[in-house]
Amino acid sequence: MNEKKLMNRAADNIRILAASMVEKANSGHPGGAMGGADFVNVLFSEFLVYDPENPRWEGRDRFFLDPGHMSPMLYSTLALTGKFTMEELAQFRQWGSPTPGHPEVDIMRGIENTSGPLGQGHTFAVGAAIAAKFLKARLGHVMDQTIYAYISDGGIQEEISQGAGRLAGHLGLDNFIMFYDSNDIQLSTATDAVTNEDVAKKYEAWHWKVITIDGNDPDAIRTALTEAKAVTGQPTLIIGKTIMGKGARKADDSSYERNCATHGAPLGGDAYINTIKNLGGDPTNPFQIFPEVKELYAKRAEELKKIVAEKYAAKAEWTKANPELAAKLELWFSGKAPKVNWNVIEQKAGDATRSASAKVLGVLATEVENMIVSSADLSNSDKTDGFLKKTHAFTKDDFTGAFLQAGVSELTMACCCLGMALHGGVIAACATFFVFSDYMKPAIRMAALMELPVKFIWTHDAFRVGEDGPTHEPVEQEAQIRLMEKLKNHKGHNSMLVLRPADAEETTVAWKLAMENTSTPTALIFSRQNIANLPAGNDYSQAAKGAYIVAGSDENPDVILVASGSEVSTLEAGAELLRKDGIKIRIVSAPSEGLFRSQSKEYQNSIIPTGAKVFGLTAGLPVNLEGLVGANGKVFGLESFGFSAPYKVLDEKLGFTAQNVYNQVKEMLA
């Protein structure tokens, strides 16, 4: 046990560095970072188990920061562990700096997650805890680890905390400990201006162990963490009552603590100088680590060497006794695409693509041992039950299955899947109706930003949902998701792969592409209704190029018809009428424009030549295909919300028929 005086000195060191980072950048959030310094100091100097020499060690504890605006606290603490230099701290929020305003995942530097909008970070941690339980059920003690999360008042207020709290408690995630930095201050008001809820009772109702402490007392923090580590059968919430801007002084040297002004702005001028002096630092040279604090963290580094050596020795014995499991561990954490015998999948002609997806999922359930699939209370409708029937759902104390029943909580489910991917060792997929992807957009964006290969399964892909009416009929959703194919990630690649297959066989290819995509998230968009298969003799492997010819390979067609999903079969029906008039037709299925645009210009021009007359049909907004049809093209799409009626009636009323394809193309060619 470290002396309280030393622990307070180390926490003050973090406060000085955090306040100075914000001051130098003239931008940032010092108050929360100063208040939370005591907890992260105790955690990193006494509890968190990791290998400083091997940051990617799969058996490490993981720390997820929810309030990304408190990044100065995390960077400063990691600097004490040797992961950041003082110069890098001083470059906070600057171009090219490794210390951006909100943390971005960087395992080598100890940053486990990109901290997105409040509420997501701790939900990532719930997903990581689920992944750890799943892996421990298969691999044993080598995955015996603790997942820590840090949440603020704002994160508690975000609606997603309801889903994360409920799910973690329901599953009894006793490998999960969350610190709630309860300082009663947020950006524009005190928390009592917006809430009077009893947070402790709320989490207790979700079956959490709740411990309330003075969050600035290192002895109380240590005791709480020790108690939490011993808890079984439930996650633990440590409510730390902290002081916003702890140690901060105003220009007149009066207290600047518990003040909203310190939340999101530099302390400034004399207030900053007085604060650094009050904390025992040098305002003229604030970027330094005190000698005794260096010694504290050097001591922890030596402790970690011994702890990790014991862990590695135990792993070596386990590997010797379990060579097959050891090989699986290595493969699963490699991030490589799994081997799947795609040839065993037998699709039924004319099936809905959601049903075709179920057949694929049934094979994946048996062939991909580290895959976890989740559904937001729709498994029998989104057809993820094809996977569930080959395994069973997680329950408290039983993670031998591979299915997460997330309940009606789409954003929570998505963020949990991101957390699973961040943990590593598992392949995560989640499903709901396409219209409910609206609830998932924040997580989709974060998956793209972090380059996480999560598989998003969205069924009931268009107005053909039918009788449920416009609230459940996606129209604009496809355009929104396809924008992610146009948005580049920081590696310069399409930030997402979006696939909407045209029939059952193309669905198998889409799933193959999704499973082989290990560098970005994938969207799989499937139909509710049955779809006629593409013309006989089609080479489905060409779907891997994003767009390909499925009928009419004439070198000089009079018109090219383009669509994705179920509209391709409508084009084929319309083409039969057009051919009777002697019109030469080429039909192109385009499951992914992003993938198509990544092909060579030569290939693109061979499918849709520059200047060709192109007609596009989409059950979404016309913009879905405008990039493919070009200046000489025309798109018939849906430009309004849908209606409640049987889907075949809607096809007729909205113009998604062979006859209207014929009429539209004839008008275009006139």
What are these regions (language model features)?
Residues L65-D66, S152, I213, G240, ...:
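Small/polar loops that bind or transfer phosphate-bearing groups
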Residues Y148, I372, I560-V562:
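Conserved beta-strand elements of the Class I
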Residues A149-Y150, M178, S374, F615:
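Residue-level marker for buried hydrophobic side chains located in beta-strands
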Residues G154-I160:
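Short acidic, Gly/Ser-rich segments with clustered Asp/Glu that frequently serve as metal-coordination loops
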